[in-house]
Curated annotation (Swiss-Prot):
Keywords in alphabetical order: GTP-binding, Metal-binding, Nucleotide-binding, Transferase, Ubl conjugation pathway, Zinc, Zinc-finger
Pfam families listed in its UniProt record: Arf (PF00025), zf-B_box (PF00643), zf-RING_UBOX (PF13445)
Catalysed reactions listed for this entry: S-ubiquitinyl-[E2 ubiquitin-conjugating enzyme]-L-cysteine + [acceptor protein]-L-lysine = [E2 ubiquitin-conjugating enzyme]-L-cysteine + N(6)-ubiquitinyl-[acceptor protein]-L-lysine
Any GO BP: intracellular protein transport
Region (ARF-like) location: 369-539
The protein, known as: E3 ubiquitin-protein ligase arc-1
Native source organism of the sequence: Caenorhabditis elegans
Known EC number: 2.3.2.27
SUPFAM superfamilies xref list: B-box zinc-binding domain, P-loop containing nucleoside triphosphate hydrolases, RING/U-box
Zinc fingers, B box-type class: 103-149
Length: 539
């Protein structure tokens, strides 16, 4: 707050805002704003001064009837109208009516060490106050019209062909092939631009300046976006730079070391290998981010240079700015067209994803290979499920013929690369199943939910597979493939009872190969089981 504000709320007084109007407490003479008077008085018929507690009666019970501090209001209006500043010199208050002109910092034409604040319209000269008085002290010169420098009219541009005429128009004729679009009245009525469409030079200049302002606004936003991106990149680089105690890299290194300290002494070598893996990953990330940073810095520098050029263009004379119209607009448009895509939040994450498997090796950012065998009777929908996972079109999801032999499809899910082995389910092929599930990490067994009469056969084959010692601790997911909303009446309960009676653990799901419903949940269950089996550390 300056010295012209309310000492209660520290807000400046205003002649335009009713709530900031200065009100005089007649009981003591102090002044507060109208808004503070409302807060202090409440519904009372009197108001107590917040400075000396003197009571002032509110005329008619309405705070609007409290006297305004007109002296202060008049002073505020003078400051607003004149654009000047009030300065205290000892006990004397001095009003500077040329404060705006001083900000221009133009040299006085009489004395270059002085700052010009006045313009003489007759002499066409910029003068300081002292030189203005000294040079116009005679009776004749004192009649010259002198105005504040901020009110100086723009310089007139004279026609190149008719030097005694002032340029007043700009040619807008598309077929005009003259050197300059600027025209005076002679050019318009009798010269090269006769009959051409045209506009006033003031309008053309203002339109051009408006376009420049729009480009400046857009470029400022782009510059701000790039600035934020650079700040984020610097933050991530700081987090991933070795030696930064508060960085994510150091936190990850410490977690890795803590893990290996809990292991036997023989794991020391593996610990150092793991730390090197983290460092190498961080170096690669930093190199990639440095490349992105350099690209954005180059664009930011170009935008800054363009903005500087456009800012200078705004204060050019009319003729000069119009002469450079095409160059200015081309520069602004080419700079605005620069790609300013920034990294998304996932690319700026400082977390380092890692996991430990049974081989005691640290894995970062690589997919874990896993073999999943799909088993089931012929026609159960195994191939349709795999094709649905591969995003095959709807009309080709359902396989018209049973699988002869096997198909292999690879699905990427989370940090796993799941190799699905779709094995044929014809009776003559079932004795070959053991050659596929013997090396499997998971078994996905599919039952046709429409073939109720084959439920017992499907359960029998599943029990035969799980009784094989080759299966071992391999997780089993059992899925009933049926259409959503398809009623099995009491057959589903019977199927669940048979599954619960099996002497091994399994995970039960329902899915629809035609629509893909429920398949994502099954794949998620498979990866959860694989993570438990592998002893993967949570990321």
């Amino acid at each position: 707050m300056n010295e012209y504000g309310c000492n209660v709320c520290n807000e400046e007084y205003s002649a335009r805002d009713p709530l900031k109007c200065p009100r005089v407490l007649t009981g003591c003479g102090h002044t507060i704003c109208h808004n503070c008077a409302i807060s202090i008085a409440g519904r009372n018929s009197s108001i107590f001064c917040p400075f000396d507690r003197t009571a002032t009666q509110i005329p008619g019970g309405d705070l609007q009837n409290l006297k305004k501090n007109f002296a202060l209001l008049e002073l505020l209006e003078k400051i607003a109208d004149g654009g000047g500043l009030l300065e205290k010199s000892g006990e004397v208050v001095k009003f500077d009516r040329y404060s705006k002109e001083r900000l221009l910092n133009l040299e006085c034409d009489e004395d270059s060490e002085h700052v010009a604040v006045i313009y003489c319209t007759v002499c066409d000269s910029n003068l300081c106050e002292r030189c203005s008085e000294s040079t116009h002290s005679t009776n004749v010169l004192s009649k010259h019209r002198r105005i504040p420098l901020t009110e100086k009219p723009p310089p007139l541009v004279h026609c190149r062909l008719h030097s005694s005429y002032v340029v007043e128009f700009v040619c807008k004729e598309l077929s005009c092939d003259t050197e300059s679009p600027l025209m005076c009245m002679m050019c318009r009525d009798y010269g090269r631009h006769k009959g051409h469409s045209h506009v006033l030079i003031e309008k053309e200049v203002e339109d051009l300046r408006e376009k420049v302002r729009e480009h400046l606004g857009e470029l400022s936003k782009q510059s701000e976006t790039i600035g934020n991106a650079l700040h984020s990149i610097d933050s991530v680089i700081h987090e991933l730079t070795p030696g930064q105690e508060d960085g994510s890299l150091e936190e990850t290194r410490q977690e890795v070391r803590n893990h290996f300290r809990r292991l036997r002494t023989a794991l020391d070598r593996d610990e150092e290998d793991a730390v090197e893996t983290v460092d190498r990953y961080a170096r690669n990330r930093v190199e990639s981010l440095q490349t992105q940073k350099e690209r954005l810095e180059a664009i930011s520098s170009k935008i800054g240079n363009t903005c500087t050029t456009l800012q200078k263009a705004l204060i050019m004379e009319r003729g000069k700015i119009l002469d450079r119209k095409d160059d200015l607009l081309a520069l602004a448009e080419s700079t605005a067209a620069e790609p300013t895509a920034v990294l998304d939040q996932s690319q700026l994450s400082t977390r380092i994803a890692f996991s430990f498997l049974n081989d005691r090796k640290l894995h970062i950012g690589d997919f874990i290979e896993s073999r999943v065998v799909l088993l089931g009777l012929d026609g159960a929908g195994k191939t349709s499920i795999v094709r649905r996972l591969k995003k095959v079109q709807m009309d080709t999801v359902m396989a018209p013929h049973p699988t002869i032999g096997f198909n292999i499809e690879t699905i990427h899910y989370k940090n796993y690369r799941l190799n699905f082995w779709d094995v044929g389910g014809l009776p003559k092929l079932r004795h070959l199943w053991k050659h596929y599930y013997s090396n499997a990490q998971a078994i996905f067994y599919v039952i046709d939910g429409y073939a109720v009469e084959r439920f017992s056969e499907a359960i029998k084959e599943l029990n035969r597979v799980m009784s094989d010692p080759l299966v071992g601790t391999c997780p089993v997911i059992v899925a009933v493939n049926r259409k959503d909303g398809y009623a099995l009446n009491g057959h589903m309960d019977a199927l669940l009872s048979q599954l619960e009676a099996l002497p091994f653990q399994h995970h039960f799901h329902c899915c629809d190969a035609a629509t893909g419903s429920g398949i994502d949940q099954i794949i998620d269950q498979i990866t959860v089981c694989l993570s438990r089996l592998n002893g993967t550390c949570p990321v």
